[in-house]
UniProtKB/Swiss-Prot annotation:
Belongs to the iron-containing alcohol dehydrogenase family. Its EC number is 1.1.1.2. Its cofactor is Zn(2+). This is Long-chain primary alcohol dehydrogenase AdhA. It comes from Thermoanaerobacter ethanolicus. Thermostable. Heating at 70 degrees Celsius for 180 minutes gives no observable loss of enzymatic activity. The gene is adhA. Alcohol dehydrogenase active against primary long-chain alcohols. Pentan-1-ol is the optimum substrate in vitro, but also shows efficient dehydrogenase activity on propanol, hexanol, and ethanol. The keyword Oxidoreductase applies. Homotetramer. It comes from the Bacteria. Induction: Seems to be constitutively expressed. InterPro entries: ADH_Fe/GldA (IPR001670), ADH_Fe_C (IPR056798), AdhA-like (IPR045910), Alcohol_dehydrogenase_Fe (IPR039697). Keywords: NADP, Oxidoreductase, Zinc.
Amino acid sequence: MWETKINPNKVFELRCKNTTYFGIGSIKKIKDILEVLKNKGINNVILVTGKGSYKASGAWDVVKPALETLGFKYSLYDKVGPNPTVDMIDEAAKIGRETGAKAVIGIGGGSPIDTAKSVAVLLEYTDKNARELYEQKFIPEKAAPIIAINLTHGTGTEVDRFAVATIPEKNYKPAIAYDCLYPMYAIDDPSLMTKLDKKQTIAVTIDALNHVTEAATTLVASPYSVLMAKETVRLIVRYLPAAVNDPENLVARYYLLYASALAGISFDNGLLHLTHALEHPLSAVKPEIAHGLGLGAILPAVVKAIYPSVAEVLAEVYSPIVPGLKGLPAEAEYVAKKVEEWLFKVGCTQKLSDFGFTKEDIPTLVRLAKTTPSLDGLLSNAPVEATEAVIAKIYEESF
């Protein structure tokens, strides 16, 4: 395949709504990025990250000296957890405001970078808080400059305008999407991802798979989102087993990261629908659930529900997983079964019962899918009408 002709050590610029430096060693581009900020009169930043990955990955070994060499003032918020809450965002924003930060650097996967995006908004809207942002009490039109240093190959948040946070007292996990949330620059360096363990590697990659499953089949899907989806699935099927078997395999990490970026661009254009709308209540109620594994638990049932309406599209997109499909509605159950078999084969084996849910929880999950701010927008993009009965059946078939 053509991938063998590409030098993964050659950093290239992936230009979409932002500029992403992509390739092994691209973390060194942070110095160039900081110089751009400095030329704009910005010399004070807040770094938003998790509790240890920014150090374990090796990113901090490059970022910290670059900040100090260029004379930047910086503050650090390193308490972002999986499925971050609005309270974490407010804590970080408070530090940023108090220290006079004029830009935000997010280091991590989707949780830290989404938190960084949200903090960037609140640095500009000092009279607002994260609950107001995620309950859509105001529509932000500006944010402080955002730099995203990505440490996982799954969310695509470094190339898109989305962010997610949980409002814990309501079990809401809404998403927001505004143009001001695009990072100014992003870094996608696969050498920072070799410390991802097997579970993390699987979870983040299944997130990317779901992004394109949805982006290719929404009511606003386009040839562009379908094209990105086809290549994403091909790369995931080829390189996920290699990364699971050998975490240090930089070629596998490179192409999974590229697949993740493509998936981010795909759903930035084609949007999302059922799997994300139905997973968000799961990880809102049980924050310990890895987002990608929650998606994997319900994906086969979603495929079964939507395939008759989008058979020709999914037959092509899923051909690396289920070869030989004819794109006929009658294939729905077969495709769902084969998708689940593939998920189990790569190590994504958990179903809703494994997360501690029972079928008595289904009415609550349906209610959250229907009432959480923003999820109605996702449901309205589904290729089938997302009635309560349809949603309940998907949950029912995911145990």
